[in-house]
Amino acid sequence: DLISYANEMPVCMYAGAEIRDEQFVSWKNVTKEEREARSLMAVKQDVKLLNENIVRCTVENALLRLIDKYDLKADEIDYFLPHYSSGFFRDKLLDGLKNINFEIPQEKWFTNLESKGNTGSASIYIILQEFLEKFPLKNGQKVLCYIPESGRFSSCFMLLEVVNGH
């Protein structure tokens, strides 16, 4: 499931604009000189907004909805494949899972952040490929994938079940 909080949260990552006095100002509304001087075309991220809200929105709120919808149970998850952009978020992610009583022990986690870095939108595919190569899987095992998107506070959770050893 893909869950977005774009309708509730301010923009966190953007390009071609800036925020002035809590208003979003497009590059189209300024002169070329001002656009260049203010680096309006550079990608920007409100790190304070991100740090204060990413786990609450994309883990706690989103996963609680899915726990109710699909009757998910943490002890039925054999592996957890989270994407996070920085090691800074690992403990915060764990705390978020604990806050909603859905703790998945870290020995069940697999990520390749240390070896591959933040590979952005390709991350879950790269993680899955490495995971399938490294772990012998058994039919019926469940793999929960977590993919947040910080620009508009969206997240995707995928629950995969092993069939025929894959």
Short names for language-model regions:
Residues 1-53, 159-166:
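Condensing-enzyme catalytic core mediating Claisen C-C bond formation in acyl metabolism
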Residues 52-63, 67, 78-166:
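Claisen-condensing/thiolase-fold acyl-transfer catalytic domains that form or cleave C-C bonds
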